[in-house]
Amino acid sequence: MFKDFFNRGSKKKKYVTVQDSKQNDVPTGIMTKCPKCKKIMYTKELSENLNVCFNCDHHLSLTAYKRIEAISDEGTFKEFDKGMTSANPLDFPGYEEKIKKDQEKTGLDEAVVTGTAELGGIEYGVAVMDARFRMGSMGSVVGEKICRIIDYCTEHRLPFILFSASGGARMQEGIISLMQMGKTSVSLKRHSDAGLLYISYITNPTTGGVSASFASVGDINLSEPKALIGFAGRRVIEQTINEKLPDDFQTAEFLLEHGQLDKVVHRKEMRSTLESILKMHAGQEVNKDA
């Protein structure tokens, strides 16, 4: 009897395992989850809203071609230097495989798309970096393509718009990558000396050698809301100076407050803002409602 009493509590309980609904995967390509508020949206509707979250207004990344489409008159974009790809000058192990993988994943040849287009009937040169490709890192091809489009704009007296999105210099190309900082800056100096307009449009994230070169030297520097902009990482800086940094440090709003940006522009106002600037520079009448 006592044996049965003690064994009574040792019997296994019957239960059913319920799967956590949070582990269910969202169908690939059909839905997109906002990385900030976690709201799930139809990818098509999100794309039509320029990848701006309907719920929290977070600006998700925008591909290079989608951004060009958003700021160009229909059918006016002409791409330059398509097909230019990186070599492996330092014989860095696995570099070619990583480049090929990113090409297959993104449909891009490199981390920047360049060319000319028109906005409001005004022709301009454009370069748009795409962080999906090697985190938008700047190697020899990125630097060369940017220099070529800047030099074209200088020769043909065109304004130039550059959208940056980058983790910095590409480590697999070593000093050749770092050289692109000076190389692109020289091309921009020639463009500036010719009295031409350069608009730097900084998007999330823009760090390292890109933030320390062409991204920061526009005649007009714009950015998207909450974009991460900086050189070294937050933790590195705090450990170096032994101080706690402000919570909004290295954000677009922080840089605007400290005079390093001219304006933080919502993506829905991107096209109208750029068109107004181009028209002012061309001496044309600007729509006051823009």
Curated annotation (Swiss-Prot):
Family: Belongs to the AccD/PCCB family.
Name of the protein in question: Acetyl-coenzyme A carboxylase carboxyl transferase subunit beta
SS bonds (residue pairs): none
Main location: cytoplasm
InterPro entries the UniProt entry points to: AcCoA_carboxyl_beta, Acetyl_CoA_COase_Trfase_b_su, ClpP/crotonase-like_dom_sf, COA_CT_N, Znf-ACC
NCBIfam families, per database record: accD
Pfam family, one: Carboxyl_trans
GO molecular function: acetyl-CoA carboxylase activity; ATP binding; carboxyl- or carbamoyltransferase activity; zinc ion binding
Known partners and oligomeric status: Acetyl-CoA carboxylase is a heterohexamer composed of biotin carboxyl carrier protein (AccB), biotin carboxylase (AccC) and two subunits each of ACCase subunit alpha (AccA) and ACCase subunit beta (AccD).
Reaction catalysis annotation: N(6)-carboxybiotinyl-L-lysyl-[protein] + acetyl-CoA = N(6)-biotinyl-L-lysyl-[protein] + malonyl-CoA
Keywords: ATP-binding, Cytoplasm, Fatty acid biosynthesis, Fatty acid metabolism, Lipid biosynthesis, Lipid metabolism, Metal-binding, Nucleotide-binding, Transferase, Zinc, Zinc-finger
Main enzyme class: transferase
Function: Component of the acetyl coenzyme A carboxylase (ACC) complex. Biotin carboxylase (BC) catalyzes the carboxylation of biotin on its carrier protein (BCCP) and then the CO(2) group is transferred by the transcarboxylase to acetyl-CoA to form malonyl-CoA.
EC number: 2.1.3.15
Cofactor: Zn(2+)
Example of a GO cellular component annotation carried by this entry: acetyl-CoA carboxylase complex
Entry's cofactor comment: Binds 1 zinc ion per subunit.
An example Gene Ontology biological process: malonyl-CoA biosynthetic process
Zn-finger segments (C4-type): 34-56
Highest rank taxon of the organism: Bacteria
Record organism: Staphylococcus carnosus (strain TM300)
